[in-house]
Amino acid sequence: MQFKSKHTKLFCLLIILAIGACLLYFWPITHLSAFAWKLRSQKIIVYLLVAIATGISTISFQTLTENRFLTPSILGIESFYVLLQTLLLVFESKFLQLEKSPILEFLVLLLLQSLFFLALQGYLKTLMKQDLVFILLICLALGSLFRNISTFLQVLMDPNEYDKLQNSLFASFQHLNTSILAIGSLIILALTIFFFRKAVILDVLHLQRETAQILGLDVEKEQKELLWGIVLLTSTATALVGPMAFFGFMLANLTYLIVKDYRHKLLFVVAILVGFISLTLGQALIERVFALEIRISMIIESVGGLLFFILLYRRARR
């Protein structure tokens, strides 16, 4: 009873903080125009979607890899998504010259990325057996390679075309990709249901691979399905607001600090609430305190990067 009461108090506190962050974000409510209401409502929805996608995908990925320092973003999935998007847009503008369809492009990119990373699953499992420093070096090198190729292709483009492509290439919290908001919401909602149903499987995988196999779990099959879902969640979040290297890492590790529990349903809910509060409250402070002179992604990357090195230092000291 004390265990349940503790989590109930935690949920109530996080929900109150989330409501407070929303009220601060919409304040003053009576002075907002219809356009401002619509824009802020869309942003609130996107903040919730990003918190859901990032929190669930990162915690699930860390369970699969048995490593709390690795995230889909650090492995370069976001950078690879940007590279695919750049290649697709360059190919369309140079060869096909068709009218742009953001939804079709988004679906094609999701399909390509899913197929690519599922094909590399065998190599990924081999990589996870290596030393953490080696893994990080490989991942940083791959991420840098993907970003440099993307930049090189963009430099070769006509300046006018390049300017037109910026909105679709690099979304942000200030400039949301609302053209795919509806389909992105459906994908994230469907995958959220999928991961909550797989939460018990993740609880078993948390006991490590050998134990899961002894308990009769088809580890290979479950890992493939979960990895596919993680790639889709990460890609959808990247398409909505752009790449955020350390947001998932920050969410997951703050959740582990807040909740001393292995059950993934509980971890998912706390991570979603923490992510939503962080994004909403952070954006409200940036608009009111910093007068939009900085971006929320800068704060997220700074805090997340600092937390990453602190935890890495603490691990090295053990």
Question: What is each of the regions a protein language model found here?
Answer:
Residues 1-318:
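Alpha-helical transmembrane segments in inner-membrane proteins
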